[in-house]
């Protein structure tokens, strides 16, 4: 089914500038659901038509197994947005997780993509039931697990996420940069704790929900996951006056790149490797676009580049950059692979 929505042909920078100039209040929310979607193309077209009409922005993944959405909705049209969402059979009763911070526009465009899975997991096991998940944990229960010496708390996020923020005492993925890598290895990583109580967590809940089902599939009996992830944990802690046991920032996959959960700064600048910082930047060299943690001094000295080579490459003529792009990216990937083993705890 083709969408009647007119394609937005503006460049990314043009969309970004338009969003920055739009002074209307917006609300950033995320939601997901594992639900059977028979016709993903029709479902996508339905979402695109309505959400374009409502001027929504965001990044949404649709698959036969469900939906994963991070969105930016006009505040004065949120009730209209919610009423329409709740009227869709696949989405009825869905709950939203609101952003902790709204410092800058979280999204500059609306992108709804059909994917094989709502979260790339690297699994190819027809016997795996993604709906057979572990029980939920509230924020209070999560705190109890953290305080329990017999319980294990495991971070289902990537290493660069855990680097800037994590729960006290959590086991973190020191050299794993994708959920696909981590999920496959999680049963092996946790096998020595198989008979203990295990609590897993992620940003908004979707990754640890699937991970809890995967651990149960691999014989783990007592696996629970934090309902609503770190985002909803922060809300519950604030509303219920609970101790906050999450230290640092919650990394988010939008233009903000993070939400401050506590005042603790637990990461170190990747460039000088001395100054404490938890601010992420993308390398100014668009061929590289490497995500790195930088301090104010290094940002000023390096000009927004993650390495001297990137500054040099960015000064080359456009045609020359196109020629070297493939080889340069291969070099950068190799460099990053080396760096991954040195991120957490630097």
Task: Report residues per predicted region.
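Internal catalytic-core helix/loop-beta-alpha segment
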Residues: 134-148
């Amino acid at each position: 089914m083709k969408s009647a929505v007119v394609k937005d042909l503006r460049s990314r920078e043009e969309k970004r500038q338009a969003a920055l100039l739009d002074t209307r209040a917006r609300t950033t929310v995320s939601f997901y659901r594992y639900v059977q979607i028979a016709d993903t193309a029709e479902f996508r077209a339905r979402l695109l038509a309505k959400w374009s009409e409502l001027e929504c922005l965001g990044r949404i993944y649709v698959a036969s197994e469900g939906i994963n959405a991070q969105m930016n909705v006009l505040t004065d049209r949120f009730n209209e947005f919610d009423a329409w969402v709740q009227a869709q059979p696949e989405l009825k009763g869905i709950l939203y997780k609101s952003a902790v911070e709204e410092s800058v526009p979280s999204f500059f465009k609306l992108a709804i993509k059909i994917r094989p899975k709502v979260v790339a997991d690297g699994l190819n096991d027809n016997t795996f039931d993604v709906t057979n998940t572990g029980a939920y944990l509230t924020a209070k229960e999560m705190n109890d697990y953290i305080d329990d010496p017999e319980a294990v708390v495991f971070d289902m996020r990537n290493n660069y996420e855990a680097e800037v923020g994590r729960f006290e005492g959590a086991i973190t993925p020191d050299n794993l940069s994708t959920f696909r890598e981590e999920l496959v290895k999680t049963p092996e990583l946790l096998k020595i704790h198989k008979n203990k109580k295990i609590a897993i967590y992620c940003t908004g809940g979707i990754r640890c929900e699937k991970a809890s089902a995967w651990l149960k599939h691999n014989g783990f009996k007592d696996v629970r996951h934090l309902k609503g992830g770190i985002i909803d944990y922060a809300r519950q802690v604030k509303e219920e006056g609970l101790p906050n046991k999450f230290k640092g920032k919650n990394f988010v996959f939008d233009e903000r790149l993070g939400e401050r959960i506590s005042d603790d700064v637990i990461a170190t600048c990747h460039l000088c490797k001395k100054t404490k910082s938890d601010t992420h930047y993308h390398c100014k060299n668009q061929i590289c676009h490497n995500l790195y943690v930088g301090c104010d001094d290094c940002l000023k000295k390096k000009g927004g580049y993650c390495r001297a080579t990137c500054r040099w490459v960015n000064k080359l003529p456009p045609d020359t950059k196109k020629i070297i792009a493939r080889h340069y990216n291969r070099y950068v990937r190799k460099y990053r692979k080396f760096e991954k083993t040195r991120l957490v705890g630097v």
